[in-house]
UniProtKB/Swiss-Prot annotation:
GO terms for molecular function: collagen binding; copper ion binding; molecular adaptor activity; protein-lysine 6-oxidase activity; small molecule binding. The keyword Secreted applies. The modification Sulfotyrosine is found at residue 187. The gene is LOX. Residues 213-417 are annotated as: Lysyl-oxidase like. Changing residue 154 to F: In AAT10; uncertain significance. Belongs to the lysyl oxidase family. This is Protein-lysine 6-oxidase. The lysine tyrosylquinone cross-link (LTQ) is generated by condensation of the epsilon-amino group of a lysine with a topaquinone produced by oxidation of tyrosine. Proteolytically cleaved by BMP1 which removes the propeptide. Also proteolytically cleaved by ADAMTS2 and ADAMTS14, but not by ADAMTS3, at an additional cleavage site downstream of the BMP1 cleavage site. The propeptide plays a role in directing the deposition of this enzyme to elastic fibers, via interaction with tropoelastin. Cleavage by BMP1 to remove the propeptide does not increase enzymatic activity but increases binding to collagen. Cleavage by ADAMTS2 produces a form with reduced collagen-binding activity. Disulfide bonds join 238-244, 291-340, 324-330, 351-361, 398-412. It catalyses: L-lysyl-[protein] + O2 + H2O = (S)-2-amino-6-oxohexanoyl-[protein] + H2O2 + NH4(+). Responsible for the post-translational oxidative deamination of peptidyl lysine residues in precursors to fibrous collagen and elastin. Regulator of Ras expression. May play a role in tumor suppression. Plays a role in the aortic wall architecture. Changing residue 190 to F: Abolishes sulfation and reduces binding to collagen. Keywords: Aortic aneurysm, Copper, Disease variant, Disulfide bond, Glycoprotein, LTQ, Metal-binding, Oxidoreductase, Secreted, Signal, Sulfation, TPQ.
């Protein structure tokens, strides 16, 4: 029984040995064996220097060859083996250095140079760079010929810069930074700048002026909210410090509970020019008013007069109003860039400097004025301290009917005088 199991196990093994060890047939030829390849030589891959010591990283592996395009003009039948034997170098460029001269060769010149090996074109690439634009830019640089009115091709990696502007001078640039005020050139995210080659009329900052400002007072704003109010001298102490009352309010016999009659009216001035309206006084000479807690940047921004309707004679002393200039509001598409601070004061193009009728010094003291018909004259930039493109729209005249207790304004218009 044990012998039978041994025969069954050794039988297949002997059969396999006979099959593998049998000599090949006469018609079959065994391919010759190639000698083993010699081990690759050590090649230097990376070398660097640190603290005066040179380090090298050696490897037996093959050198990495990045993928590159084959020049269409160099594709010649039968040249595959020759090109495979040529050493390849890593691609380290970012543009295509092929010139346009190869494209404009004549048939004769191409025939002469057919036997010469053409240099392999190196293709330079970078993320975000267009290959077609790179070829066009390379061709224009190689030809070195540009039409008189033609602008050379520019890379799309960097937009063209303006020559007449300064760096960071665009008021619509969201990354513009100013050490004076973080809200200077404030960029409104809800109002994107319109694309186009021309700048909008609001372009202009303190560094780069585009034309001149043009102040215009709103006559309808004055007419809508003119009224009479009585206030005690106790509540007018801050206004008295800024000389906002009539001369009779500064007499020695005036007491705190005495009342003054005030003709109140609002004012809204718009800069419809193409440049910023900046204060006439330099920043170091601005006056700080502790009572109102702000700086006055102009000696006389507005002037108020009450004239007799028949004789045009002044019946109430005019008031010099030196305000804190700022962009209270702006038209759609324009942005606030000035605030009533110690650093930035002014009026941007397309913006308004608004003063309500309830603030201090926005009035004329009419305590000594009798009832009758008068003319309210409001002048903006009356002394022409700041240059403007048009001075004929700086005055507003309104007809005032004063009853002794109430005042009614009508017929407010812009006047040249």
């Amino acid at each position: 029984m044990r012998f039978a199991w041994t025969v069954l196990l050794l039988g297949p093994l002997q059969l396999c040995a006979l099959v593998h060890c049998a000599p090949p047939a006469a018609g079959q030829q065994q391919p010759p064996r190639e000698p083993p390849a010699a081990p690759g030589a050590w090649r230097q891959q990376i070398q660097w220097e640190n603290n005066g010591q040179v380090f090298s990283l050696l490897s037996l592996g093959s050198q990495y060859q990045p993928q590159r395009r084959r020049d269409p003009g160099a594709a010649v039948p039968g040249a595959a083996n020759a090109s495979a034997q040529q050493p390849r170098t890593p691609i380290l460029l970012i543009r295509d250095n092929r010139t346009a001269a190869a494209r404009t060769r004549t048939a004769g010149s191409s025939g002469v140079t057919a036997g010469r090996p053409r240099p392999t074109a190196r293709h330079w690439f970078q993320a975000g760079y267009s290959t077609s634009r790179a070829r066009e830019a390379g061709a224009s640089r190689a030809e070195n010929q540009t039409a008189p009115g033609e602008v050379p091709a520019l890379s799309n990696l960097r937009p063209p810069s303006r020559v007449d502007g300064m760096v960071g001078d665009d008021p619509y640039n969201p990354y513009k930074y100013s050490d004076d005020n973080p809200y200077y050139n404030y960029y409104d995210t809800y109002e994107r700048p319109r694309p186009g080659g021309r700048y909008r009329p609001g372009y202009g900052t303190g560094y780069f002026q585009y034309g001149l400002p043009d102040l215009v007072a709103d006559p309808y704003y004055i007419q809508a909210s003119t009224y009479v109010q009585k206030m005690s001298m106790y509540n007018l102490r801050c206004a008295a410090e800024e000389n906002c009352l009539a001369s009779t309010a500064y007499r020695a016999d005036v007491r705190d509970y005495d009342h003054r009659v005030l003709l109140r009216f609002p004012q809204r001035v718009k800069n419809q020019g193409t440049s910023d309206f900046l204060p006439s006084r330099p920043r170091y000479s601005w006056e700080w008013h502790s009572c109102h807690q702000h700086y006055h940047s102009m000696d006389e921004f507005s002037h108020y007069d009450l004239l007799d309707a028949n004789t045009q004679r002044r019946v109430a002393e005019g008031h010099k109003a030196s305000f804190c200039l700022e962009d209270t509001s702006c038209d759609y598409g324009y942005h606030r860039r000035f605030a009533c601070t110690a650093h930035t004061q002014g009026l941007s193009p397309g913006c308004y400097d608004t003063y309500g009728a309830d603030i201090d010094c926005q009035w004329i003291d009419i305590t000594d004025v009798k009832p009758g018909n008068y003319i309210l004259k409001v002048s903006v930039n009356p002394s022409y301290l700041v240059p403007e493109s048009d001075y004929t729209n700086n005055v507003v005249r309104c007809d005032i009917r004063y009853t002794g207790h109430h005042a009614y304004a009508s017929g407010c218009t812009i006047s040249p005088y």
